[in-house]
Amino acid sequence: MTLNTDLIRTRCLEIEESVSRLERLQALSRDAFLADQDTLDLACYRLLVAIEAALALCYHVSAKRLHRVPEEYAQCFANLRDASIIPADLTERL
């Protein structure tokens, strides 16, 4: 089965946009960051978007290339590592 390049492109863009928004928040001091509920909400939302996009990519690749999907989120990236689709150091970070 072939990978859905539109899905992959969309999810990668979601991750890139989220990381970019989160990186901009690094300019804030810790106190300023923690004092602003809207900023905290934005950070939480962008983290969730990036995590969901990464998992969607993982499950898509698992289904199409490995012909199976893991029962647990944590196992998804390990399956791709074991199949030599992603490097071990990336698996550890994810």
PLM regions: where:
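Solvent-exposed interaction patches of small proteins and small membrane subunits
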Residues: 1-94
